[in-house]
Amino acid sequence: MLIFFFIIGTVFGSFLGLVSERWDTEASILYGRSQCISCQSPLKWYQLIPLISQIIFKSKCHLCGVKFSYSYFILEFLSGTLFAALWFDLDFLHFFTLIISLLLSKFDIDSYAYPLNIGLAFTACFFILFPVTPIAYFLLALACFTFFINIGIGAGDILWLFFASFSLSLEEMLILIQLASALGICFLLIKKRKKIPFIPFLSFSYLIVILLPQTLLG
């Protein structure tokens, strides 16, 4: 069953990659065959097998030889790992937050933003599925405020913090923000960039916070 959960997760991760790739295009998310982004040739069925196809073909198109982004391999692997973690009783709220973080991170890496309607859809899901905390209301209001007024951090980042606040205490949220900021600054200095996608750092910090024992966090 563990392997089954992992395989299902890799398939779902592949779907998340498809969503991020086709969202701003006219191509259908649910219909139509995947194709090479360079030569537009349709991919064979065996080239669509998550993880394995990318290992065998070295993340290249079999016709034109263009290299595909390794982010798809990482997305499929991480999604498979999260689904496998359900077998070990990973809390569903943590699982749901991490899964949507994968998709939002992919959008953020590609374009430093994610679609507003996706953010609104996930917001509705959290309100429907989970109890709302006071800090969640505050962060949602702050996200709406920053959507219209630039304060140096994107509304999308704050909306992600809104999602995380459903499963973290105020103290854990502060630790998460400090850790993500430190990691982001280190990345900026090492890579000598002026701008970075912040949601991947928030997501990684979230994972660390939920895995660390409460005694260490305290």
Task: Please give the residue ranges for each predicted region.
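A membrane-topology feature that recognizes alpha-helical transmembrane segments
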Residues: 1-218
